Each structure stands twice: as structure tokens, then as C-alpha cells.
Amino acid sequence: MQEQYRPEEIESKVQLHWDEKRTFEVTEDESKEKYYCLSMLPYPSGRLHMGHVRNYTIGDVIARYQRMLGKNVLQPIGWDAFGLPAEGAAVKNNTAPAPWTYDNIAYMKNQLKMLGFGYDWSRELATCTPEYYRWEQKFFTELYKKGLVYKKTSAVNWCPNDQTVLANEQVIDGCCWRCDTKVERKEIPQWFIKITAYADELLNDLDKLDHWPDTVKTMQRNWIGRSEGVEITFNVNDYDNTLTVYTTRPDTFMGCTYLAVAAGHPLAQKAAENNPELAAFIDECRNTKVAEAEMATMEKKGVDTGFKAVHPLTGEEIPVWAANFVLMEYGTGAVMAVPGHDQRDYEFASKYGLNIKPVILAADGSEPDLSQQALTEKGVLFNSGEFNGLDHEAAFNAIADKLTAMGVGERKVNYRLRDWGVSRQRYWGAPIPMVTLEDGTVMPTPDDQLPVILPEDVVMDGITSPIKADPEWAKTTVNGMPALRETDTFDTFMESSWYYARYTCPEYKEGMLDSKAANYWLPVDIYIGGIEHAIMHLLYFRFFHKLMRDAGMVNSDEPAKQLLCQGMVLADAFYYVGENGERNWVSPVDAIVERDEKGRIVKAKDAAGHELVYTGMSKMSKSKNNGIDPQVMVERYGADTVRLFMMFASPADMTLEWQESGVEGANRFLKRVWKLVYEHTAKGDVAALNVDALTEDQKALRRDVHKTIAKVTDDIGRRQTFNTAIAAIMELMNKLAKAPTDGEQDRALMQEALLAVVRMLNPFTPHICFTLWQELKGEGDIDNAPWPVADEKAMVEDSTLVVVQVNGKVRAKITVPVDATEEQVRERAGQEHLVAKYLDGVTVRKVIYVPGKLLNLVVG
């Protein structure tokens, strides 16, 4: 064994061994308990970043630990390879998205191997290959036949100059990212999948997900947004149709003083025919895309349509306004406004001088003060005619019943969730398998024409999708008749909604899934990824699983038993102000810093002498230039060091602060482990351990070893607090470094301890552990070694520490046998100099003894 720890030599050697032996390839084995450990698949952007490294290290630690427990562990990896960034990169680099993507995959695959992740590479998949997306296309056609897919018009961002649709991220300050033309909103036909048909099940089954973070479940509950309320119909004077609104607060209905409709509502459009102000307002709303997140904070604007609706219970005429906070795609595109009891309605009414009518009493029974804000709490009704004096629930039911009896109301359950629009007017995605015949009939692409292959040898102009620009591509024949293919492609969330299931049978040619393999491995036992995916990906992931279940492919209701959302990786961020006042961000690698005695950064400059402003720790990002390249760190310290730091620096679900000093610390620790094994093995062979012949000190050390095994097992397995597991191993290492190594049993005990330490560290730092296991002559490869089991007998304490007090003040701490009697403890305490001093010449009036813990002698 060489004396120095040289990761650059051992890591490549061990990785080659894993490749040659196909160590992590698995097949179904009914005789073994399975464990499916999955990290969210990466987008092949070109290089791994520290967020990837953290995610995949957590997954690898769990997978290797479960493997050592004797389970049949599947840990696959693949590439979420379609998407908009490839189009931009292709234009920039004068290439096509396909070669750019495949080059990135090859590069990043090597990076993953360099980090020593134990993946089953035989299952690797890339979602941009026809072998993958053909089954997604087939499944889509089946959903269409089931009535779960439909087409309707929906608004998109449209660049009138380039005559093209823009993704949300391509709209910058309301303008096209490429030509700076003002972006318009345009309605175009798009494909939707009826996720709303599964809304109740998606909501109710959250209760089955005991091992998902509550934050994620709450976000999904709110996103699905189930509410119970009443749909109310208003007659509108001088208008051919009625207006329907939905409210969850029918108890406030007597306080409704105006209605608001979306700018795109037919009533607003009709009113605008003779109202230039309203027509201009509608235009403004049409060209302003409002994300729901921004709705709460944006300025509320509106224009009176001139129409008057009739309140069905009071007969009063109330105005109908067009307002920018009402969206056509939500509900009916019309809302009732109760400004006395809804803050948004209150602000709008105050701004435009509309009537504000209170109908709910304040908590103390007085009329509410509405001079500053609305009263939004529930309470007792007044100012409401026959409903006065009713509390919230009674009023809800009474008003709902009355409206129903009059034929103008209906109790309804509503959802915030909208159907999933899967059409994208992009090139680099899976073609949507639908065709239109000459007579206008729309139908699915026949099975014998699947997959509809996306041409990869294309020229990108940065404006129009190559399959839209080439009229020949769309031409096809169906049943001998000419037809045109759909030129939209799927939302890339489609591919990432079912990849986890395809990993169970990546070579299967007969269909989307081999049910036997899928049902052996599924559901996923632990799924690891960022909380930013809580509502989009993780909802579609659950939805797709239910679709596949209902198609008879899988027999479970949910795709993953446990979800672990890892925290973000933070790093120091620095900038200097340029000549034009702009911020120039400087990489923390290039910052020369001064620290105070507490290690805080007080001053910083770069190599060019710029005084730097330190903004603290923030998420690693390109915009702040504070990303740390994992490859550089691996080349400097080795993969094991980077992995160990990642798992030690912070609990897995909390943010991790990148500190190179911490990486250096992890490296020093691994050098200490190496050195201890080197010194131990240099002394030659070891005798067998005789546990019955150990001295008290040897027993105490062995107790520490087995207590550490018990703690680390619990920390990794049950608690998943990996940082505390590493801390416990480090603490044990400190004790082993000080332990005597001269006697035969000292060395036998050291052998047992080091074999345990190396196995406990193996999930975290597999390369060094593989090597040290061989040097310690462990049985076989460590990859097939069992997890160490704590010896219960070794952990039993045969002595205990008792605190001795005289009149409540601590005078000594003594070690006594665990079975010592009170008399024996008193006798032993009396031998302590300080205790004897305070007992000299006084009478012990009372003895308080807590067995094995405390002896208090009360004297007087």
C-alpha cells in the first residue's frame, strides 16, 4: 500500500473496475427486496453544476447504502434532452440542436462517471430519441381515443415582426428577445390533456404520500385549488346573454355592487364596438401577459362597459366593468365583486368610485369600519334582508338554497387547476402525432406511421421551426388520402412525466412499458430533486402514473413513495461597479478576501485591483458568476472529497454554503483515514479478535465502535441526516487515532474498527473505501460487502458515571459498576477528596440517590 493518499490514481482505477464488472447493472429478482432510487434526470446543458452534484450524490449515497443492506437496487440515469435552450445554442454555434445535444450528453456522461455515481448505465435513455418518444406519441393517440385529449384556441405570445410564437422566457419586458418588437397576444388552436378529469384523485391521493414534504403537498393542494361554492346567473339589460359568476362566499352576496368581466369576454367585446376607451383597454390587456403570480401585485385597472346587470335577490341594477384582474381562461371570465368584504374588489371600487356595501358585522358585533380596507373575515350578516343574523355557514346554505330555488344558482365544486396545454410552437420537441385530412377531419396518426420522427439534420434560422418552415415535412397520406401533419411539438414536461417508468424496461419493443418489469420496480422508493418542481413536473408525474395505471400498464396509484427535495447550493457573490454604473460580477475563485477574527469577509478585491462589493451567499448562478465548476474541484481534491463535503456541510434538505476551506477539511479527513489504514496494515497480519479477553479500555473503544455503527445506521437509514452520520464517523476516527496499537488484541480491535469505518464511509466516498477494503483484506469487493451490524452486547455499559453532590452542589463525578448498590456508591464517593472534605465533622441528615445518575448528600 502506498503511503500517500492519491485520489487521481485510485479513482480512475476503481471507476474502470465498476465499468468492466458492470457492478451496478441489475435485473428483476423476486427473491430479493427491491429498492428503486431515482434522482431527477438532468437537462444536457453542457456541463454539470454543483446543484447536479449535490442531487446525484444524495441519491448515490442512499442507493449504495440500500445495496449494502442486501437489496436489489436500481439507480438509473438519463437525459431530459428536448427543449428551447438547444435551439438558441444551435443558432449561436451555427449547428443543429441534435448534434449539440448529443455532444453535451457525451461530455456530461463522463463528468457523472468521474464523480463515481453507481448508475446502471445499461438503462440510460435520452428523451429526444425516436425509440423513446414513439411510445409517448402512441400513448397520446390512445388518450385522444379515450376522450382525454382535445383541441381549443388558447393565447400565445406572438412576435408580429418574425411572425412566430415566443416562449414566455423569450419575452423580455414585453418585447421579442430577438428583434425587440412589442409582443402581442394571439389566440391559436392548441392541444390539451384533461388533467382536470383527475383533479379529485390528484388531490385526495396526496393523503397517501406520507413521505413527501408537507410543503410540496400544500403547493399541489393550492394549485389544484378545490373549492365549494355557488354559480350564479345574472340577467343583463340590453344584452342577449346572461352572465354567470362563481363565488365561494355566497354569504356576502347581498353586498355585491358590481360585476367584472375579462377584457376578452364577449360582453366586453360587444360594448367596445361603440366605446373607443374600452376598445383601447381591451387591446392593452390582450398584449399584456399576466402570470398568476403577478396578479396580486399589479395595478388593477378597468373600464365601465355601460351594461347593467340585475341583482337576482335585490332587483338592483349594478354596473358591469371590464377589468384586467379577470382572466378568460379561469372560470367563466366574469366575477361578482363585493368590495366591503374582498380587498381586491375594495381597491378597485375605491379607485373608480363604485358603491361599497357592508353586509358582515365585525367580530365585536359592530358595523365594520371600511374607511381603510375591506373586512375579509367571516361573521354574522346584517344589511341583508331576510338573511340578517345568520352566521357564515347558515348564510352560505340559505342564500345558495334560495338562488337554486329561483333557478339562478347552482352549487358547484370548482378547481383552480386547468387542463394541460401540451402544444409548443417550437422545433426541438417530439412531434404531436395528429393529422388533418383535406376535408378538415382531425385524427390521430395511424399506429403504422408511428413514430412521427423529428428530422435532426436541419438549419436553424432562430425564427421559425424548421418543420413549420418546410411545407413538405407536413405532407403525408392517411388511408390513401392526402393529409397534413401537426407541426407543433409536445411540451417537454411530457417526456419527463413517464421516464421513471421506462427505466424499468428501456429496451422493451412491444409497447410503452413491460408491465412485469414496471410492477417489479415501481413505485420509485425515493425520488430526489429540487422543490422548484413541486407543482409542474411533480403534478404531471403523478398524473401520468394514473393515466398509465388506467391503461393497465402499472398497478400502483402513485409513482414515488418518498420525495426528498435537496436544498440549493450557495456561494459567495462579489461585484464591482463599472464605468457606466453597471455591476460586473466577479467569480469567488478570483476574489482576494480579507476576513475578521470570526472569519467574516470584511474586504475584497480582484486581481485587477477593483474594490469588490460582497453581497453575501447566494444561489450559484451564471448571472452572479458565482458558480464553482465541479470538474475543477474533482481534479484538485478528488471526487470522494467533493462528495464528502457535499454530504457533511449541511442537512440534505437545507441550503448548502460552498466553502473551499470545508472542502480542504474533508480532504484532510480522508488523508487521516488513509494514514491510519496504512500504519495499521504496515504492521502485517492481524490475530482474531477475542471479545472475552479485552481490557476495560479495549471494551470501551469497542463500545464506541458499535455505538457509532448503530448511530450511523439510524442516521442514514431512518433519519436521512447524512451530515450527522459523517460527524459520528469523524468522532470515532479521532478516538481510533489515539488508540494503542502495540498489543495483539489492540491490533485485532483496530482491524474490526477500520473494516467498520470503511464500510460506513463507502456510500459517501466509494473510491477510497474500495481501495482500503482491499488493503484491509476485506472479503470480496466492498460493493458486495454487507453493511456493518452493531453488536448489542458490545454496546452494553458495564460502568456508569454518577454525579456526587453535597447540599446540592457538585463535588465529584465518579465511575461505578452499573449494578453497584447505593451503599457501594456512597462508599466510593467517600473516597473522593472533595467529598470527604465536606463530610468531615458533619452529620448526613438525608440521602437522595437516583440509581446510576446522582447521589446528593444533605448535611447539617
Swiss-Prot record:
**Coiled coil region boundaries:** none
Under Enzyme Commission nomenclature, its number is 6.1.1.4
Report the GO terms under cellular component. cytosol
Q: Which InterPro entries match?
A: aa-tRNA-synth_I_CS (IPR001412), aa-tRNA-synth_Ia (IPR002300), Leu-tRNA-ligase (IPR002302), Leu_tRNA-synth_edit (IPR025709), M/V/L/I-tRNA-synth_anticd-bd (IPR013155), Methionyl/Leucyl_tRNA_Synth (IPR015413), Rossmann-like_a/b/a_fold (IPR014729), tRNAsynth_Ia_anticodon-bd (IPR009080)
Q: Which residues bind ATP?
A: 622
**Catalytic activity, per the record?**
tRNA(Leu) + L-leucine + ATP = L-leucyl-tRNA(Leu) + AMP + diphosphate
Single GO biological process annotation from the record: leucyl-tRNA aminoacylation
What positions does the record give for the motif labelled 'HIGH' region? 42-52
Assigned keywords, A-Z:
Aminoacyl-tRNA synthetase, ATP-binding, Cytoplasm, Ligase, Nucleotide-binding, Protein biosynthesis
What CDD domains does the annotation carry? Anticodon_Ia_Leu_BEm, LeuRS_core
Signal sequence bounds: none
According to the UniProt entry, where does the motif 'KMSKS' region sit in this chain? 619-623
Which coarse location class applies to the principal site listed for this UniProt protein?
cytoplasm
What cystine linkages occur within this chain? none
Q: Does the keyword ATP-binding apply?
A: yes
Report the SUPFAM superfamilies cross-referenced here. Anticodon-binding domain of a subclass of class I aminoacyl-tRNA synthetases, Nucleotidylyl transferase, ValRS/IleRS/LeuRS editing domain
GO molecular function list: aminoacyl-tRNA deacylase activity; ATP binding; leucine-tRNA ligase activity
Q: Which HAMAP family match?
A: Leu_tRNA_synth_B
Recorded family membership: Belongs to the class-I aminoacyl-tRNA synthetase family.
Query: Could you tell me what this protein is called?
Result: Leucine--tRNA ligase
Look up and give the organism this protein is from. Answer: Escherichia coli O6:H1 (strain CFT073 / ATCC 700928 / UPEC)
The uppermost taxa in this organism's lineage are:
Bacteria, Pseudomonadati, Pseudomonadota, Gammaproteobacteria, Enterobacterales
